[in-house]
Amino acid sequence: YLYFTLPMALNYQRNSYTLWESALKTYNDNETRFVFNPKICLEKSFEEVQYALTKYKVALQKQKQTEIWLTLCNTFTELFDGNIRKLFDSLNNDVDKIRNFIQKDNKKKFPYLSETKICNYWMYVIYQYTDRKYKNIEKLTVAPDTHVCKATHKLGLITEDEFNSNNVQQIVIDRWQELFKDTKYKPIDIHTPLWLWSRNGFKEIE
């Protein structure tokens, strides 16, 4: 769970694929694997953690991103004894409760992970790559990053003015929620197709 959580907070303004390649190299190296254990991280010096995070470029901004990582380690240790599974268990695997806990009640304790785009996508990754099941998965909204917003605009679901507005992320979330309401489809399911479609330049399918 921590492997899919801590790097996610550094997943902004960078290539996601290279981030996870870096995370895997860091995990597979006995010298740097400790960064995925919050308690051990907090016992190390700042410089030791910084070195481990930058060795394979998990952290690109070595000062700021090491601070983010350590803040999260402190949060996970303080609130959940280093076991983030307890976060989901204590909130009954309820998407709304988890999101409110991170984005509203404890926003400062979850730097970047509390941001709208990253928080939704992180919960999706946990759902997709672990054994975690949410009781209301339909509440998990699309993760409105740049590519998803562009693809939503390309499909004509938002106007040019909406696409250029400061509130475009929330508009995209609301539009997909409205579209899939009372259907068998879940907004988060279309994140990857939209993201890949935009990232590849909206190529026509032959």
Where are these regions (language model features)?
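HhH-family (HhH-GPD) DNA N-glycosylase catalytic core used in base-excision repair
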Residues: Y1-E206
